[in-house]
Each structure stands twice: as structure tokens, then as C-alpha cells.
A protein has these predicted regions:
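Structured, active/binding-site neighborhoods that engage oxygen-rich ligands
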Residues: 1-225
Length: 225
């Protein structure tokens, strides 16, 4: 689990510096072999906004589980993911930080550093109502947005949660801010593959991908062709 999140942090810390740039542009800045290390900020690699958001999603899932175990009752997990996503978004603005914090990650300065340049996502998270697959908040499709589904895939597996519920929650977490079906269905696919890998780590990836595609057709095909 830790290795997966660290892998995201490491990869995005390197990758965001060359995002949306051509190979020629990268070579001009970093030499003929391209980017070979981090662009350090005060001696440290950046914790990017999508890494932060993935971590806060995990925080929300853990908060919901803890509440359920301690109090014997809880709301649907997506409510806690929405709450944690809003608190992260508030940390990315110079104003409007919440007076009551539910996410303990807000005490980690490196996970709250203002790094998000995606104003559309921040605007969506500031609205009174967040998106769902049935009632999308927008038609947005940001590739980094599916990182929110990573926590779902890590947190659940078939032994304790129905696979359809896992896939739906993967879609719902992305749909909070990304209204395009191609975005939130990708979240469902990612959650499906990761949860299955946890249960059966030796299954071939090609088989898992094909299985995930069929599962999406079965679960979402009547709504999205």
C-alpha cells in the first residue's frame, strides 16, 4: 500500500515538470537524454497536487471506517471522500481554510503546499454540491483526476466488499470533480484492477484488463455505450 502511494509520489514529482511538453522541448531544457532526475525546490522534490489528492482520498476512507468502527454508524464512503477532497481544496487556496478539520493530513505541511494549478477542479470542490456519475458537475476530463480512485482500489477487496460496489465507488470518487464518463469510468477500471490484484497478485495484467472492461460493460453499459 505504502509502496503504491510512494510510487505515485515519485513518478508525479518527476513527471509534472515535463507535462504537456514535446520531446524536443524536454531535450532543450534537460539535454539529449531528457529528464533524469527531480527538479528540486529548496532541496526537496515536490509533492504534487494529484499525489496530495490521492492521499486525502485515503484519509477520507480511513476516517469513514474509523467512525463506523467507533460509533457503529457511518455515512456512505463517498461522503467522507467528498469531505476530505474539499478540505484538501481549501488548503490550496490562500483563503477559506476550514475552521474544523477532519483530515489529519492537514497537519502535514508538505501535503498541503499550494501546488494545484487546476482551477477548474478547485472551483468544482468549492461548490455546494459535488458531482456524481448520474448528475455530473461538469464535462471535465483531467487525466490526473483518476488518482483519487487509487485509494479505493487499495482500501477494498472482494473478500469484504462486493466488486460492483468497489467499481462504483471508484467511479464516484472521480466523478466528484470530473464529469466526463471517460474520466470516471476510468476510475472504476483502475479501482477494479487494483482491488483484484490485491486479492490475486499473480493474475496476468492482460487478463485483468479484459475482465475490467467486461465488468464495466455489465455494470455501466446500459448508461454509457
Amino acid at each position: 500500500y505504502r509502496g503504491c502511494l510512494l510510487g505515485l509520489a515519485v513518478g508525479d514529482a518527476m513527471g509534472y515538470t515535463v507535462d504537456n511538453r514535446s520531446w524536443q522541448e524536454i531535450q532543450e531544457d534537460y539535454g539529449p537524454n531528457g529528464l533524469l532526475g527531480y527538479d528540486l525546490v529548496n532541496g526537496y522534490a515536490d509533492v504534487t497536487s494529484y499525489t496530495q489528492l490521492a492521499a486525502f482520498t485515503c484519509n477520507g476512507l480511513l476516517f469513514g471506517l474509523t467512525r463506523g468502527q467507533m460509533l457503529g454508524k457511518m455515512a456512505p464512503f463517498i461522503k467522507y471522500v467528498g469531505m476530505s477532497s474539499r478540505e484538501w481544496a481549501a488548503s490550496q487556496r490562500p483563503w477559506g481554510r476550514p475552521t474544523r478539520n477532519y483530515c489529519w493530513l492537514l497537519r502535514k505541511a508538505e501535503l498541503c503546499r499550494r501546488h494545484c494549478m487546476d482551477t477548474r477542479m478547485l472551483d468544482t470542490l468549492s461548490r455546494q454540491t459535488l458531482g456524481t456519475p448520474e448528475t455530473p458537475a461538469n464535462n471535465y476530463d483531467s487525466p490526473g483526476g483518476i488518482t483519487t480512485a487509487i485509494g479505493v482500489g487499495l482500501f477494498f477487496h472482494e473478500d469484504r466488499t462486493d466488486q460492483h460496489e468497489i467499481d462504483l465507488l471508484g467511479a464516484e470518487t472521480v466523478a466528484l470533480t470530473q464529469g466526463s464518463p471517460s474520466a470516471f469510468l476510468s476510475g472504476a477500471v483502475l479501482a477494479h484492477i487494483m482491488s483484484r490484484l490485491i486479492r490475486q497478485p499473480h493474475l496476468p495484467l492482460k487478463r485483468l484488463v479484459a475482465e475490467a472492461v467486461e465488468a464495466m460493460k455489465e455494470q455501466f453499459g446500459h448508461q454509457y455505450s
